[in-house]
Amino acid sequence: YSFTDKQGRTVLTRQMNNSEEHDTYYIYNDKGNLCFVLQPKYQESADLGKYAFQYEYDARGRCTKKILPGADFVEYTYNAADQLVFSQDGNQRAQATKKWTYYLYDKFGRLTEQGECTNKSATSSPVVYIHNYYDGYGFINGTGFTDSNYKLTEAQKAYGKGYQTGSVISIFGDSKKIYLMYQYDIQGRVVKTVQNNLLDGLDVTETTFTFSSNPQTVVHKNTYKENGTQKSITETYIYTYDYADRISKVEHTLNDTKVVLSENTYNKLGQLVNRSLHGASADIMGYAYNIRNWLTRIESPNLILKLNYGYSAGGGNIASMFWKSGEEGRQKYTFTYDGLGRMLNADHLILGQQDEDDDDWGVTTGLMSIQTGRQIEETPLARENAFTERVTEYDKNGNILKLVRYGQTGANSYGVIDNLTMTLTGNRLNRVDDASTASAYGGGFEFKDAVKQDNEYAYDANGNLTQDLNKGIEDIQYNCLNLPRLVKFKDQSTITYTYAADGTKLRVEHKIGNSTTRTTYCSNVIYEGGTAKCLLTEEGYVSLDDREYHYYLKDHQGNNRVLVNKNGGVEEINHYYPFGGVFASEENVQPYKYNGKELDTKKGLNWYDYGARQYDAALGIFTTVDPSSEKYYPTSPYVYCGGDPINRIDPTGADWYKDSDGNYHWAERGGDIAEGWTWVGSSVSIEISKSKYVNYYENGGIKIRNDKPNFSRMESYWSWL
């Protein structure tokens, strides 16, 4: 439900969890500016500081103060042209010498400089973080742009007018800077980028385009110094397209050795039906869909995955998932949801063996095939609830209050390994108590309840996690982008992060006991201790010590299920709990796992790096506030995917839009949004009959239509293809 006033402003949105109302209220001032948004939890506990978004405005209607739930206020100052020139958040205000972020613009309103200063004065000791250049290339004669790769002919400079041509970006905690240059062609397409890296080298990327402006060739050269010797890595991508401009083949050349990285085949409906890796020698992936264009099956020699959908008021959520990885046995999850589409139960089965041709895959007697409705033959069942995960209670903002997780407790035994009760202060986690006495066998994935006290978790003024006593973390420090700078453990072990001022992660250093390891990220090349370790490709990675190709076999969410070599040999198998924990995996040769994100397990950290935030899969929460939380008002800014990790993935940056005909579309932010479409949000509740609703969420491009064809529900899942 959405309620509006006489001026068409939304004053209430209501989502129904069966008969329970989840209400979000919107309050405006006399000038029509939004002043308060009261989350559903506010209706139970009227605390503005914990459960309200708050805004203040000046006489010109510009927001001068903003408060997110559980965070200190952010202050904004504008110039006469209504441009933001200063901002200050809670962490900047809490420093001994208060800091402000400042912004400078050119006469066209383009950001030219951003940094920090000590007060709102042009002479207040500014520290420049980002300096942008436009229209020309005079800057390449300055400091930092001395390499010949930055030099352009007069003809090459001619097409930079109207575009950003370069940047100088500071590196937090390092005296070095990133010097970046863009070169354009006559159509305004970037044909060359040059930037330096932390290893005294450069990353140079040159691109040619097809007539329809799709990349045709991409040549990337990475140079670096290793033990004082200059070395280089050169890779080339060649893209081939079919008549509909869909990628049909991707070739990859690494230092003059060419392979066919992938080949795609599509059916007459435009659906991807086959995908071969490494010229089909690594794997051939087949894809099947139902009449609604939803993905139902992925099948290859090393990964089989089947999805069944429920057709109740849940709106087509995934009801069960079968899979088989490598030579291992079949497994199944059966999912149930509450009225808001949040996961309640993910019941796990290890299935008995069954004929490969039986499409219904070993389900116990009494269950009905979701697709056919017929009775399924009984088959041997090896184990129930081996790796079940259940959320037994949410609050009205979607925060998990109780979670039960099953796992392996012995060589041949399984049981409850986590029986968690979360205590919150507002949306912030304060304490976790584990009632289970069993532990995961062999040091497997589980929550470690190391202490039992109040305030096990602490936060700074911006809502960033600064203490996790259950992991032995006594302090977490952040840079001005709310990205971690230092994680300090009780035993004085540390993890130090190096970021550029634009948020790019450049280096991570682990000091654990007497051991120090350093990982450096230079574009898609990863270095360990200054030695090139691997090169990430569109389908996996190349290990640079032996120049061998490795390929990820992904499921519908982009989770890396199986790692194979160029000959199809299985090198790693990963199985996941719904919220991302890794269980019962074979080998562990690389860190990219759930959603394809990097997992850091050192010192028991167990964080997934999602770029803007770190994610703790044991608790199903992020460590910092969602930077886009104002687009998801009813939901806690810490929860993962609104409590639905089955049908959603967080990093897609997608939302619901409504067109002029009243149809709802799922579209990428920044993508092709048609004229007349209006933003709805991450979810939409539609009345299908009196007092009955269908809630649609971030789970793909379903289109509630009048008379037009449906979009693919799995569209957002396939953004990684």
Place the predicted regions along the sequence by residue.
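Beta-turn initiation residues at beta-strand->coil junctions
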Residues: 2, 6, 12-18, 24-26, ...
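Short turn/helix-capping motifs enriched in Asx and small/polar residues
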Residues: 567-582, 603, 611-613, 617-687, ...
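Short, small/polar residue-rich loop motifs at catalytic or cofactor-binding pockets
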Residues: 20-22, 49-51, 70-72, 97-99, ...
